[in-house]
Amino acid sequence: FTELSKENVIDLAIKAEQTIFKDTSGADCTVCTHGGIIEYDKQGGFKKINSPNDFTLIILNSGQTHTTSVTVSKVKDFKENNEEKFLSLCEKEDVLITNIKEAFRKNDLKVIGKSMSENQNYLEEIGISNDKIREMIMLVKNYAYGSKITGAGDGGCIIALADVTNLDDAMKNLQVKNYECFSVKIDSRGLDTF
């Protein structure tokens, strides 16, 4: 094998992802390759956000499959039919992003969690959530600072910022409810061997 740079790996990973979803942003490939927390823009690239990464996440799987292109189309339709509301949500999201970047730097779990829940409310307004997602978010509320859809929406998983003081109880109770779930930490290294 020849040694590949991280940028080469990202290019190859994006090409592979495009076989499934032609308009992939490349964000997932980039964060997996570089690790940590990043700010990502499809045209502008990425910038690492320095954070102590001192938190635990819970991933819950709804078991519902979805098609990213269908969900993206729903967002596009919402935007075209609700231009003012969509613009307002984008402006709110810009403020939210600024606040959460600072919260990541400070490792402020309460602000990060509140921001995740706020973002979920915006996704609800756009229409890419569903009853199963809402049920999971309500269920994890007692164990997390906040939670939201991860990925395209319309199914798939949610991600919750865990309160580690009751993580064991959270995992037991979520599994009793027959949810596939697991806890994770953020890997700050990313890809280190290929």
Model-based region annotation:
Residues 1-6, 11-23, 29-148, 159-194:
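C-terminal nucleotide
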Residues 156:
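Conserved glycine-rich beta-strand-loop-beta hairpin in the small C-terminal domain of fold type I
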